[in-house]
């Protein structure tokens, strides 16, 4: 039996010390037979093969019929045509009707393995010929003055690759696993050619595409087809209203509208409202037709009839029961997904569904197990093909009026995630100093199950920072995590706007190039940092100017009538959310990542060039330009002796804090000149740290050209050697007062860390101490090194292995090998 020792000391307001040791994981997942069968069926659907979307075809059909009509009306009619035309399907075992499968059916023209190999060879040969012809063509970023383009130029010109995991393998003509195999084959075949591995991956992922051609061009060029994604669509309001009442409201607004622009908006709103209502009514008919025609049991026929009756009712009347509320929520969600929606969020589902659950329990209609079965169905629906786009759920926190919001449905949702064992939805658990103890206990139980959920979000940090953006106390109290980690107000904001991501480490390159041109500019480390901050300011300003251009393009061209129908403010203002109609402003996220790499690199510059004078600027510049070839001893010293972020070392943590503080202030300052929207700083890298790292040169911390940068707010891979407490202390050292967009800190734990009750309590205390001392966010996941390494060799044995990538989870076998290796290289706590 393992003895568990726990010691928790709060050293300072923002410092914690926790010693933990424990062994072996907890109880087995509890699924009833229906959910087991439903899960297996959905996994089989995901593994069935390549899927072709019919969105472009349906939209193009409508656009051909509406030439000459106003853009907003054409957009609404195209969406209505999609809902009217798409095939509706009924799946085995499900208790929630509605699926995207009719929109994305299996693609028939998949190449054979031999054809894939031959086509890939042709693609690479043509690429190499082009490279040989064009003497100025450069297939990789060079670290030095001869490099004419900035990092941002290279990224925006699509120098990097993208398909690092299966769910972003959009519009592909071969399966992701086949793409990985053919890439591997070509890397081996051309290992001696003038081509980098990432170039091979990039060219092949672009080449193996389904030829949508004119349909896709028409969809995106005629309107353009812009839509709300990374958004919550006010499901709580809608399930209490129903479509009939909403349609009546739209008609009332339309009858009173005198302004032509408002009248056009209401006409578009009426088209999509009626289309949504008709889609759900048609699903009731589809279910009943299936019931009559399919060879199914009487019990199954009764279940199908219940779904049909709920669909029929909730179109015309508000939901009365938990089952009705969750079914209508899913229908609203699937309708938005039909137009290509991505990262749609259920937001605070334990708040708006809880009254229905509470009422049903009191009246004897449902118990916790039955509620969990329905939630399990919802969790699994989110994991169906083409639905797996980081759709989020937010739990816990406080109510709009500041009271504890955790309830029995919060617990059931967390237990559902643990039992179902799927990557989505992405759960954000809001926590604060007033939370009941059971909330942390349930969070650790869920994480222990290996599902990668939940992430913890600190109410005290995010509510305060939302108020700094100008939000009311009530709206700030109501925040949710959209998609991965991004912070928004539910039901009141248009979609999340994305700026060009800023790689903190790459900006060092520009400073070094400036020194090469003008050595007199850098005499001290302060001089170096002044130039570095100037690069940060320039990158932030470039993002602002890019948004100005995007906004000019969006004006009077970009509309999403369906999402605008459901977002607060649009009906009242008579204006689409993308044209400024929403109650709350759009957030434009200035992403930045690689804090570990940049902090370590700047610390190396300070220590070895300016403090100890062991390296000259010329030597460092030359070493980086040559990727440490001929400078192996220098690289070894940098790797061994540079203080690394993530170990609780003030020397390097101070630098990390200075960089982040400057960046956050620069982003916040953009709001002084932004007229309507808000600019927010988001310390999160999705998987940018991989594909940006692949095309970037060496860095002063000893990292070589092409290697990954550090992940989001995490340390450089494997360099946090002093345990989880020191890592969290480094994070607590950073000033997060102006972090307004989002934050991702990954925390990988061996499952043996979470055995026995004492081990669980130790982790609870660690997380609670971190939150109470001001930690903004943390996401833990359990895995062991043996499983990760074996899954690279025998993926078929590890189909259900889930890992945290950035601010989201994914099956490990659905990641490309470079991303898999980066996750393996992260420190695994509790292994020894």
Report the location of each language-model feature.
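Extended non-globular scaffold/tether segments
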Residues: 267-278, 282
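Short, low-complexity S/T/E/D/G/P-rich linear segments that nucleate or cap local secondary structure
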Residues: 16-18
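Extended, non-transmembrane alpha-helical coiled-coils
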Residues: 278, 282-285, 289, 306
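A conserved hydrophobic secondary-structure block that centers on an alpha-helix together
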Residues: 293-295
């Amino acid at each position: 039996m393992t003895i568990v020792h726990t010691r928790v000391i709060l050293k300072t307001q923002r410092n914690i010390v926790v010693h933990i040791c424990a062994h072996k994981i907890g109880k087995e997942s509890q699924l009833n037979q229906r959910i087991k069968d439903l899960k297996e069926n959905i996994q089989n659907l995901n593994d069935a093969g390549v899927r072709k979307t019919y969105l472009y075809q349906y939209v193009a059909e409508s656009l051909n019929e509406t030439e000459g009509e106003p853009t907003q009306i054409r957009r609404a009619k195209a969406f209505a045509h999609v809902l009217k035309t798409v095939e509706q399907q009924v799946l085995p075992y499900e208790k929630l009707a509605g699926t995207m499968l009719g929109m994305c059916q299996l693609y028939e023209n998949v190449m054979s393995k031999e054809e894939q190999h031959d086509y890939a060879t042709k693609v690479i040969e043509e690429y190499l010929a082009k490279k040989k012809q064009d003497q100025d063509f450069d297939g990789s970023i060079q670290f030095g003055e001869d490099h004419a383009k900035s990092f941002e130029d290279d990224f925006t010109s699509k120098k990097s690759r993208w398909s690092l995991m299966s769910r972003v393998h959009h519009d592909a003509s071969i399966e992701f696993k086949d793409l990985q195999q053919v890439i591997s084959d070509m890397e081996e075949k051309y290992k001696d050619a003038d081509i980098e591995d990432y170039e091979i991956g990039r060219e092949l992922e672009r080449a193996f595409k389904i030829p949508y051609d004119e349909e896709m061009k028409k969809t995106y060029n005629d309107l353009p087809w812009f839509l709300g994604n990374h958004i919550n669509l006010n499901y709580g309001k809608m399930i209490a209203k129903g479509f009939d009442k909403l349609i009546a409201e739209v008609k009332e607004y339309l009858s009173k509208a005198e302004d032509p622009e408002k009248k056009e908006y209401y006409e578009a709103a009426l088209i999509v409202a009626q289309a949504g209502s008709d889609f759900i009514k048609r699903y009731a008919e589809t279910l009943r037709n299936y019931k009559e025609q399919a060879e199914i049991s009487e019990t199954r026929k009764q279940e199908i009839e219940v779904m049909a009756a709920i669909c029929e009712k909730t179109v015309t009347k508000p939901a009365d029961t938990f089952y009705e509320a969750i079914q209508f929520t899913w229908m609203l969600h699937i309708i938005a997904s039909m137009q290509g929606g991505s990262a749609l969020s259920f937001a605070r589902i334990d708040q708006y569904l809880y009254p229905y659950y509470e009422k049903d329990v009191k009246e004897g209609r449902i118990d916790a197990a039955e509620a969990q079965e329905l939630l399990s169905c919802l969790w699994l629906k989110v994991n169906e093909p083409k639905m797996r786009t980081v759709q989020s759920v937010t739990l816990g926190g406080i109510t709009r009026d500041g009271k504890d919001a955790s309830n029995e449905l919060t617990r059931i949702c967390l237990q559902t995630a643990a039992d179902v064992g799927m990557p989505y939805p992405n759960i954000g658990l809001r926590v604060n100093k007033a939370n009941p103890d059971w909330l942390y206990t349930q969070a650790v139980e869920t994480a222990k199950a290996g599902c990668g959920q939940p992430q913890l979000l600190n109410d005290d940090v995010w509510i305060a920072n939302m108020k700094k953006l100008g939000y009311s106390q009530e709206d700030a109290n109501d925040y949710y995590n959209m998609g991965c980690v991004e912070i928004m107000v539910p039901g009141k904001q248009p979609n999340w706007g994305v700026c060009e991501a800023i790689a903190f480490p790459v900006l060092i390159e520009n400073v070094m190039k400036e020194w090469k041109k003008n050595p007199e500019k850098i005499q001290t480390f302060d001089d170096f940092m002044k130039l570095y901050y100037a690069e940060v300011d320039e990158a932030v300003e470039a993002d602002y100017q890019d948004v100005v251009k995007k906004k000019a393009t969006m004006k009077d061209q970009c509309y999403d009538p369906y999402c605008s129908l459901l977002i607060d403010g649009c009906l009242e203002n008579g204006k689409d959310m993308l044209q400024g109609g929403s109650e709350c402003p759009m957030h434009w996220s200035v992403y930045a990542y690689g804090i570990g790499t940049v902090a370590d690199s700047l610390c190396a510059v300070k220590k070895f060039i300016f403090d100890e004078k062991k390296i000259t600027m010329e030597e460092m510049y030359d070493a980086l330009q040559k990727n440490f070839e001929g400078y192996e001893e220098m690289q070894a010293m940098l790797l061994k002796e540079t203080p690394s972020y993530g170990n609780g070392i003030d020397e390097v943590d101070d630098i990390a804090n200075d960089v982040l503080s400057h960046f956050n202030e620069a982003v916040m300052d953009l709001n002084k000149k932004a007229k309507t929207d808000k600019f927010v700083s988001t310390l999160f890298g999705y998987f940018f740290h991989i594909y940006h790292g692949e095309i970037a040169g060496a860095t002063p911390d000893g990292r070589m050209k092409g290697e990954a940068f550090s992940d989001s707010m995490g340390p450089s891979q494997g360099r946090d050697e002093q345990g989880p407490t020191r890592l969290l202390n480094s994070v607590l050292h950073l000033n997060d007062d102006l972090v307004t967009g989002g934050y991702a800190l990954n925390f990988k734990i061996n499952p043996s860390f979470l055995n026995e009750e004492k081990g669980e309590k130790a982790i609870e205390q660690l997380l609670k101490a971190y939150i109470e001392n001001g930690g903004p966010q943390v996401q833990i996941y359990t895995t062991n090194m043996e499983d990760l390494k074996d899954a690279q060799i025998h993926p078929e044995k590890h189909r259900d292995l889930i890992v945290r990538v950035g601010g989201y989870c994914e099956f490990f076998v659905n990641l490309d090998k470079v991303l898999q290796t980066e996750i393996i290289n992260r420190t695994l706590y509790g292994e020894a």
